């Protein structure tokens, strides 16, 4: 079952989510939108098992990273009718 990982622009570039992921689904990429000049990216979502450790590790009040499991993926991305 595939999962979607969405990184929001409230990411502060702290790397907590990247370090929390046991399967290296996430990585940091350059971004000028925060002081850290980097943002989380999810280039390997096919490896995501939906453990949501990245969500738990996120220190922002906005939960800058979200994992949408299976059926949630279509609904959360606005693709379901």
From Swiss-Prot:
Q: At which positions is [4Fe-4S] cluster 1 bound?
A: 11, 14, 17, 58
Membrane topology category: Peripheral membrane protein
Annotated GO molecular function terms are: 4 iron, 4 sulfur cluster binding; electron transfer activity; metal ion binding; oxidoreductase activity
Might you give the EC number(s) for this enzyme?
A: 1.97.1.12
Q: Name one Pfam family in it.
A: Fer4_7
Task: Identify the residues that the record assigns to the 4Fe-4S ferredoxin-type domain, covering every copy.
Answer: 2-31, 39-68
Q: What Gene3D superfamilies has UniProt attached to this entry?
A: 3.30.70.20
Q: Where can this protein be found? A: Cellular thylakoid membrane
Q: Which cofactor does it need?
A: [4Fe-4S] cluster
Predominantly, its location class is membrane
Tagged with keyword Thylakoid: yes
Kindly state a single biological-process term from the GO annotations of this entry.
Answer: photosynthetic electron transport in photosystem I
The intrachain disulfides are none
* Binding-site residues for [4Fe-4S] cluster 2, renumbered to this chain: 21, 48, 51, 54
| Reaction catalysed by this enzyme | reduced [plastocyanin] + hnu + oxidized [2Fe-2S]-[ferredoxin] = oxidized [plastocyanin] + reduced [2Fe-2S]-[ferredoxin]
- InterPro entries in alphabetical order: 4Fe4S_Fe-S-bd, 4Fe4S_Fe_S_CS, PSI_iron-sulfur_center, PSI_PsaC
Gene Ontology cellular-component annotations: photosystem I; plasma membrane-derived thylakoid membrane
Q: What does the Swiss-Prot or TrEMBL cofactor note state? A: Binds 2 [4Fe-4S] clusters. Cluster 2 is most probably the spectroscopically characterized electron acceptor FA and cluster 1 is most probably FB.
UniProt keywords (A-Z) are: 4Fe-4S, Electron transport, Iron, Iron-sulfur, Membrane, Metal-binding, Oxidoreductase, Photosynthesis, Photosystem I, Repeat, Thylakoid, Transport
Query: NCBIfam families annotated for this entry?
Result: PS_I_psaC (TIGR03048)
Described by its record, this protein's role is as follows: Apoprotein for the two 4Fe-4S centers FA and FB of photosystem I (PSI); essential for photochemical activity. FB is the terminal electron acceptor of PSI, donating electrons to ferredoxin. The C-terminus interacts with PsaA/B/D and helps assemble the protein into the PSI complex. Required for binding of PsaD and PsaE to PSI. PSI is a plastocyanin/cytochrome c6-ferredoxin oxidoreductase, converting photonic excitation into a charge separation, which transfers an electron from the donor P700 chlorophyll pair to the spectroscopically characterized acceptors A0, A1, FX, FA and FB in turn.
The protein's matches in PANTHER family, at most eight in alphabetical order, are given as: PHOTOSYSTEM I IRON-SULFUR CENTER, PHOTOSYSTEM I IRON-SULFUR CENTER-RELATED
Oligomeric state and interaction partners are given as: The cyanobacterial PSI reaction center is composed of one copy each of PsaA,B,C,D,E,F,I,J,K,L,M and X, and forms trimeric complexes.
Q: What is this protein called?
A: Photosystem I iron-sulfur center
The record lists the lineage as:
Bacteria, Bacillati, Cyanobacteriota, Cyanophyceae, Synechococcales
Query: Which gene is annotated as encoding this protein in its UniProt record?
Result: psaC
